[in-house]
Regions:
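Conserved non-catalytic scaffold segment of RNase H-like nuclease domains
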Residues: 1-107, 113, 120-142
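Acidic, Mg2+-coordinating catalytic module of metal-dependent nucleases/exonucleases
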Residues: 84-100, 120-122, 126-191
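Acidic two-metal-ion nuclease catalytic site recognized across multiple nuclease folds
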Residues: 156-235
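A substrate-engagement module of RecA-like helicase motors
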Residues: 218-228, 235-246, 304-435, 505-507, ...
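Conserved pre-motif I regulatory segment
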Residues: 232-280
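Walker A/P-loop NTP-binding motif
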Residues: 269-270, 289-303, 323-327
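Walker A/P-loop
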Residues: 274-295
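Signature of the SF2 helicase/ATPase Hel1-core->accessory helical subdomain module
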Residues: 292, 298, 318, 408-436, ...
Length: 623
């Protein structure tokens, strides 16, 4: 077995070109056996900032007599040699070591990538949090040797996790990462080879299938249908459940009698029975959740009618569905059906996941997220994003490519192509049959904006955390786009040699006649050119917006809060704003021409979609 060196550095800052190393810690190990350690402070030849001293505990006096980095390099080079280097966010450490001429060709391993994949539901992936989660006997202290020891311990624990993975999933992760360098490839190859001494045969089997995809789809059943003759609630009878000596006090030991809760409960019961609107303010400690859940549940059961509850925060949504509603079920002792429904982007799409696997990952972010999916789905029964940690905008961009947020996939298409096993379809089925349905403000308002085409029919609505409704409405009814989003979209679109357009060309070669293929190739080349032109003109557009905002600040520095400007008629006459309009006209012109080319490509795909190839339908949906 080859030894590995876990390395951690403390530095004067984050940029290796402008900052330097102040401490080096390294641990050489083989399996779980520590072979040697290396530790030294480094004289940076400059002052250490108070921030770094507070973070690391390393001050100027401590490094004043320490050796310079040039004196340390020979010993560190001899300690590491050509062994693989392990780190947590290892690119950071290696970038500083490369800057002083060290270890430019060493293989690198990253415990961040390992943890992100093998612990898909971990709340945080920083070194300190992982050390606590995995019960590492050392603490991450922002001192180099301590953190190197924790990194080695995290590696050892995570490698044990890898050895416990199903062999077909390990094989699939190794196959998918075959042409992409990333920080955990060494670990999965090592684990696979240890479990299977035969040569790797990269199966394209359904390694991702887990409980949710193996269980039969839910049976189609009639949606909830309200009674015509509504049965009113007795407000005092409903609130008696929350009185001293009531059912709640007998079941739950933490019962506390709250007069305000009783009053709110009775008022909501009367509101439901009499059919009027209610605006109520409940202070902290009122117990408002139970005050509205109990009458809502009883009303929905008596009248076979749905009550929709909208919240602003995920925390409250989780509290309602995982704690409060189960308590209500126990309290009223009935067959209350309750579920939570989220936006499409919160659910995995197995069809898009399979298409993503077929094209193979093209970056470390893509292989990391895809590997995380395979491991998560071996256990998940929901396909719900809330179960896992998608960390940062780059991972979020990958998730967007495999989520159910696909306008081209309708319920009918989902049932036809996937047999109703899709997480979003299951969630909608549960919502259709629920007496109490929990959503968030964003989904509620999206349903309003689309003419009630998202949520099942409802007549009764309770808006909790209503003080956030105005800002949620602003967000729901507005449009937002950023320069990085445009650049990611253009990259995904690609051209003749990469991305979506390249996949369209590749698939079409097996179907189209030479003349039609040549025409498609020409259109794709035109689309590639227009995409490049739009990308450049959109950059100029955002630059002009930046110049306009800077002009509006009139020399003032940008503060902590974002800068807001209302575009009123007087603003539109200013030269900086005229530059914005001119740059947008150019970007818009390129975008329109790009759309025209994409429409022509889509028309070609439509003509050949009757060949029965699902990949054509996937490409049409993506484009």
């Amino acid at each position: 077995m080859t030894s590995i060196v876990a390395i951690d550095l403390e530095t004067t800052g984050l940029d290796p070109k402008n900052n330097v190393i102040i401490e080096i810690g390294a641990v050489k190990f083989n399996d779980n056996r520590i072979e040697d350690e290396f530790s030294t402070l480094v004289n940076p030849g400059r002052a250490i900032s108070p921030f770094i001293t507070k973070l690391t505990g390393i001050n100027n006096a401590m490094v004043r007599s320490a050796p310079l980095i040039e004196e340390i390099i020979p010993g560190l080079d001899n300690f590491v040699r050509d062994l693989p280097i392990l780190g947590h966010n290892v690119k950071f450490d290696v970038s500083f070591l490369n800057q002083v001429g060290l270890f430019k060709d060493n293989e690198t391993l990253d415990t961040y990538d390992m943890a992100s994949v093998l612990l898909p539901d971990a709340g945080r992936y920083n070194l300190s949090a992982l050390g606590q989660l995995l019960n590492i006997p050392f603490k991450a202290t922002h001192r180099a040797l301590d953190d190197a020891k924790v990194t080695q311990g995290v590696y050892a624990k995570l490698f044990e996790e890898a050895l416990n993975m199903p062999l077909d999933i390990l094989a699939e992760i190794v196959r998918l990462g075959e042409f992409t360098h990333w920080g955990a490839e060494h670990v999965f190859k090592k684990a696979f080879n240890q479990l299977n001494r035969d040569n790797l045969k990269g199966s394209r089997g359904k390694a991702f299938l887990g409980p949710i995809f193996q269980n039969p789809p839910p049976e189609e059943s009639e949606p909830l249908t309200a009674r015509n003759d509504l049965i009113s609630l007795d407000a005092e009878e409903v609130s008696s459940l929350l009185e001293n000596g009531g059912a709640y006090s007998k079941i739950f030991p933490n019962f506390e009698h709250r007069p305000e809760q009783i009053e709110l409960c009775q008022t909501i019961a009367n509101t439901l029975s009499e059919g009027y609107h209610l605006l109520a303010e409940a202070g902290t400690g009122t117990g408002k959740s139970m005050a509205y859940l109990i009458p809502s549940a009883l009303w929905a059961l008596k009248n076979s009618s749905r009550v929709l509850i909208s919240t602003n925060t995920i925390n409250l949504q989780d509290q309602l569905i995982n704690k409060d509603i189960p308590d209500v079920k126990e309290l009223i002792g009935s067959e209350l059906k309750a579920s939570v429904l989220k936006g499409r982007n919160n659910y995995l799409c197995p069809r898009r996941l399979e298409a993503f696997r077929k094209k193979r990952p093209e970056s470390a972010d893509e292989i990391r997220v895809l590997a995380k999916m395979l491991i998560w789905l071996s256990k998940s029964e929901t396909g719900d994003l809330s179960e896992i940690n998608i960390n940062g905008p780059r991972e979020r961009a990958v998730w967007n490519q495999i989520s159910a947020n696909d306008d081209g996939c309708t319920t009918e298409t989902c049932i036809k192509r996937m047999g109703g096993i899709c997480p979003i379809h299951r969630a909608k089925q549960a919502a259709n049959q629920s007496h109490v349905l929990v959503v968030n403000h964003a989904l509620l308002l999206a349903d309003v904006a689309t003419g009630n085409r998202i949520l099942p029919d409802y007549k009764y609505l309770i808006v909790d955390e209503a003080h956030h409704l105005e800002s949620a409405t602003t967000n729901a009814l507005s449009f937002r786009v950023t320069q990085p989003e445009i650049e990611r979209t253009i990259k995904e679109l690609g051209g003749s040699n990469s991305g979506l357009l390249a996949r369209i060309l590749k698939v079409s070669k097996t179907i189209l006649e030479p003349g039609s293929l040549a025409s498609l190739n020409k259109i794709i080349q035109q689309a590639t050119d227009k995409a490049f032109q739009f990308q450049n003109s959109s950059k100029n557009f955002f630059i002009s917006i930046g110049n306009f905002l800077e002009d509006q600040r009139e020399g003032r520095k940008l503060g902590t809060y974002s800068q807001r400007e209302r575009i009123v008629p007087s603003i539109r006459t200013l030269p900086p704003w005229l530059d914005v309009e001119v740059s947008w006209e150019e970007a818009q012109g390129n975008l329109i021409l790009l759309f025209e080319n994409i429409e022509r490509i889509n028309s070609t795909l439509t003509e050949i979609s009757d060949t029965g190839q699902e990949e054509i339908e996937d490409l049409m949906s993506n484009i």
